[in-house]
Amino acid sequence: MDAEEFFINLFDKIETTLKKTAQEKILTRTWGGQLANELIGKGCPHRSERDEPYFALPLQVKNFKHIYESLDAFILGEMLEGDNAYYCDKCEKKIPTLKRVCIKSLPNYLIVVLKRFEFNFDTMQKIKVNDYFEFPETLNLQRYTLDFLLEQEQSLLDGVGGESQMEVADKKPHSYYDYDLRGVVIHKGNADAGHYYSLIKDHKDTGAGNGDQARWLEFNDTDVKEFDISNLKNEAYGDSATNNLDPTGKRNKRGTNAYILIYERKQLFNEKSEKIDD
């Protein structure tokens, strides 16, 4: 069982245990968001939307160098055309349709799973993707949300005198989309075997003599020690031609990279997207 499977099983067990209690929705309120699965007709005014709950956002690593590149691809979608065109019940015909997924709502604590494990159908083996993949300490997700995309589409329609069939939601404050990195789960090894350890930002201690820089800790089995966040690149981003070189010029930490990221919203919000006072 890898870390993602453990996380899924843990949340399933917690949800089952809390059913019919006062805290039944605590995981959803804290960690849960919603994705919007959209079908957008091209050449017809109709569109459909199906909501999908999530506790973790899965992002591709392969072929991307940065988390924002992967997020751009996440919401890009695909065109259904020709034989694959979508049948519009209202138009009573097949039409070219954009099928895409975007973020409808965000949780206070966002889990991002980096897809570092995949199945190679040529070799019929599970492999680990050790490619370099950068992620920031501060993350803004506004342009990957349904509200933002609808607003952009409405602006385009306004420019050409068109009319949208979708209602644009009330604007959320910018702080709704801003996150700080709070934790990183590192995997060291290959697709068949390995070891996990965690980097966690100390919420209470800013670090003596370190100004406003928060203290980070490394939790590795029973070993707990301070971690210098300036070393995050070498510890967690993965392998590249120029990354992870030791003093002799040889690569080190091959196979050691981030697998799961935990981001905390800078300003907490409730289910109604209202700020929660500190």
List each model region and its residues.
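Papain-like cysteine protease catalytic cores
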Residues: M1-P53, D89-E92
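Exposed substrate/partner-binding surface patches
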Residues: K19-A22, I26, H46-D278
